[in-house]
A protein has these predicted regions:
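Secretory/extracellular carbohydrate-interaction modules
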Residues: 22-89, 182
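Short, aromatic/His-centered strand-loop micro-motif at the edge of beta-sheets
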Residues: 91-112
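Bacterial N-terminal signal peptides that target proteins for export
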Residues: 1-8
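Short tryptophan-centered beta-strand motifs in secreted/extracellular beta-sheet-rich domains
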Residues: 109-117, 124-126
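Short, solvent-exposed beta-strand-to-loop segments that form ligand-recognition rims
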Residues: 129-154
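Bacterial N-terminal signal peptides
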Residues: 8-15
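Sec/Tat signal peptide C-region and signal peptidase I cleavage site
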Residues: 17-21
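Extracellular carbohydrate recognition
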Residues: 165-177
Length: 186
């Protein structure tokens, strides 16, 4: 993994419990807490964010999401896709996480994720392609996180890791190959 000075600084700040906001490098890794990185441009319409996500442990708890600004906590993140501690991938829908279909994950496997975001409607859909497999739709027209119903623009990619039910940080995930483009019909 190629680490850039900004990524190293972000990891150090996160370890100290301080939020980080900066540009997206080639590869970013979550840690305990929130890290945020600038999208290439602030988004105000319908758009897609695609990226490769790799969980570094089984049954971890971490998400990748999109927010308006550097988040202070998870309530500030509008759209999220998560590797949960039950070993499946789920998506935030308003006030809770769920998925339209169950998709398990394994440590150190790459999952191509695509979030199709409709900012005007405050809805998004999520598609995931496990390495070597076709893309599947996990979420169709899910609502933004309840606290983000009034957001007008999105400009940050957010990575986060959390402690599991036993109070232990169970692992991080990596994100690479981030791309942003105008939304196409799924």
């Amino acid at each position: 993994m190629k680490m850039f000075p900004t990524a190293l600084l972000a990891l150090a700040l996160a370890a100290a419990g301080t939020a980080w906001a900066g540009p997206i490098a080639e590869t970013q890794q979550s840690t305990l807490g929130l890290l945020s990185f600038d999208l290439p441009a602030e988004q105000t319409g319908s758009f897609e964010v695609s990226f490769d996500a790799t969980p570094l442990a089984d049954k971890m708890d971490g998400f990748t999401g999109i927010s308006a600004a550097a988040p202070k906590n998870a309530n500030d993140v509008a759209a999220m896709v998560r590797f949960n501690d039950a070993g499946t991938i789920d998506v935030r829908d308003g006030g809770s996480f769920r998925a339209d279909r169950e998709l398990g994950y394994s440590a150190n496997k790459v999952y191509r994720m695509r979030m199709v975001i409709d900012l005007a409607r405050k809805k998004y859909s999520v598609y995931v392609a496990p390495a070597g497999q076709p893309e599947v739709q996990l979420a169709a027209n899910y609502a933004f996180r309840t606290q983000q119903a009034g957001v007008r623009a999105l400009g940050k990619l957010v990575l986060a890791g959390y402690k599991n039910a036993n109070g232990v940080f169970a692992g991080a995930h990596r994100v690479s190959g981030v791309s942003v483009k105008a939304a196409s019909t799924p």
